[in-house]
Amino acid sequence: PRGYVTTLSDEKGRKTVAALVSGCGKRVWPVGRLDLDSEGFLLMTDDGELTNSLLHPSHQVEKEYLVWVTGDVETALPILSGPMELDGEPLAPAKVTRGRESGGVTQLSITIYQGKNRQVRRMCAQAGLEVTRLKRIREGQVSLDRKLKPGQWRPLTAQELAALRKHL
């Protein structure tokens, strides 16, 4: 959930995702990160090979986000789905679809294939959009379980684990 640091311990004393899974019975770690002000799907595992496979850019594992933005969305859409760079490095083109709009805030679905630091927020900023909320809803073929409340977790099903292992 928002307000948690995606790490196992924090020298500043902030809440960590490790506290959320302390009762799982294994030592697990996060696969990738979510920003402190982001929310949604976060995979935790004790499998180093799976972690490396999902994080390695050559595997192009999809990460899908719902992003609530303000700004000129019409102008931003072709920028977001076209060739972009972050820190001088080219990004794989994102898949972007426009969703609902309410009160000047537009919901976008953005699928990326890399996991650079604050990538979606920085892409939106480059396109002239301000992100008001960001929620990861999918990694690879595994989607956020909408029955879970923020901070809750569950083990992967055999089918979900098999889908993730395809990237090995």
Predicted features and spans:
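Basic, flexible Lys/Arg- and Gly-enriched helix-loop patches that mediate nucleic-acid binding at interfaces
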Residues: 1-168
